[in-house]
Amino acid sequence: MSDKKYNVDEGEIAKFSRIADKWWDKSGEFKTLHDINPLRLDYIDGHADLCGKRVLDVGCGGGILAESMARRGAAFVKGIDMAEQSLETARLHAALNNVADIEYECIRVEDLAEAEPHSFDVVTCMEMMEHVPDPAAIVRACANLVKPDGMVFFSTINKNPKSYLHLIVAAEYLLKFVPKGTHDWKKFIAPAELARMCRQAGLDVADTKGMTYHVLSQTYALCDSTDVNYMFACRPAF
C-alpha cells in the first residue's frame, strides 16, 4: 500500500461515496448527523469562539459541520475528506447557498499536517475516527495542524456493550436510523484510549462531554455519561 493510501479504508470510502448525494437530506441516511449538528456546533463555538477563526474540519463528508461553522462566523473553513463524491456535494451545496470563505480538498489529514503545520485556530474531527484503521495517526495529525493557542475537537463512539446495542442493534437494525453497516463496533474507541492518544500527540483534554438522544424530540443534549457518543475539547500541551 502506498503512503497516499495509508490510513484510508477503501471500503469506508466506497460506502459513503454510494450515498454522497444524500448528505443534505435531513430525513435520509444522514439524519442523525443533522440532528447532532446543532449540539456539536454550540459545543465547539462555546469553547473556541469560531468568529474570525481559521478552521479545519477533518472528515467533513458533505459539509454539514463545515458549512455551519462558516455560517457561525469563522473567517475561513477548510473541509477535507477522502471521498471525492462527498466533497462535490459539499462544494455544490455551499455554492447554491452562497456560503463564502469555505473550501474543500480531497487530501489525507496526515499529508495536510506536513504541508500546513500549525496553521489553524480550530481543528475538528467529528464522527470520523471510528471509520479509519489508525485513529492515533489522525490525532497526531490534528495536533500538528492546530496553532499553539488553538483547540482541537474530537467526537466518536465508546466501545462497550451499550454502544453496540444502541448504535448497531437499535440504530441500524431495529429503528433503521442509519444504513446497516454504517458502524463497525471493533473500531469504536473508549474515552480512556482516546485520551491516551491525545496525551501521546501532545494534547491536553480540557473537557469531556457525552451526548444523549431524545427520541420524541429527535434532538441531542450534552450529558456527563460517555457510555455511547462523546466529545473531547483539547488544547496543545505546553
From Swiss-Prot:
Which sequence ranges are marked TM in the entry? none
GO BP annotations of the record are:
methylation
InterPro entries to which the protein is assigned, alphabetical: SAM-dependent_MTases_sf, UbiG_MeTrfase
What EC number(s) has UniProt assigned to this enzyme? Answer: 2.1.1.222, 2.1.1.64
**Pathway linked to the protein:** Cofactor biosynthesis; ubiquinone biosynthesis
Q: What class of enzyme is it?
A: transferase
UniProt catalytic activity: a 3-demethylubiquinol + S-adenosyl-L-methionine = a ubiquinol + S-adenosyl-L-homocysteine + H(+); a 3-(all-trans-polyprenyl)benzene-1,2-diol + S-adenosyl-L-methionine = a 2-methoxy-6-(all-trans-polyprenyl)phenol + S-adenosyl-L-homocysteine + H(+)
* Sites where the protein binds S-adenosyl-L-methionine: 40, 59, 81, 126
Superkingdom of the source species: Bacteria
Keyword annotations for this protein, in alphabetical order, are: Methyltransferase, S-adenosyl-L-methionine, Transferase, Ubiquinone biosynthesis
Q: Does the keyword Transferase apply?
A: yes
Which molecular function terms from Gene Ontology are attached? 2-polyprenyl-6-hydroxyphenol methylase activity; 3-demethylubiquinol 3-O-methyltransferase activity; methyltransferase activity; polyprenyldihydroxybenzoate methyltransferase activity
| The protein's role, per its UniProt record | O-methyltransferase that catalyzes the 2 O-methylation steps in the ubiquinone biosynthetic pathway.
Q: Which family does it belong to?
A: Belongs to the methyltransferase superfamily. UbiG/COQ3 family.
> Which HAMAP family does UniProt cross-reference here?
UbiG
Write down what this protein is called.
Ubiquinone biosynthesis O-methyltransferase
Source species = Neisseria meningitidis serogroup B (strain ATCC BAA-335 / MC58)
Its taxonomic placement starts with:
Bacteria, Pseudomonadati, Pseudomonadota, Betaproteobacteria, Neisseriales
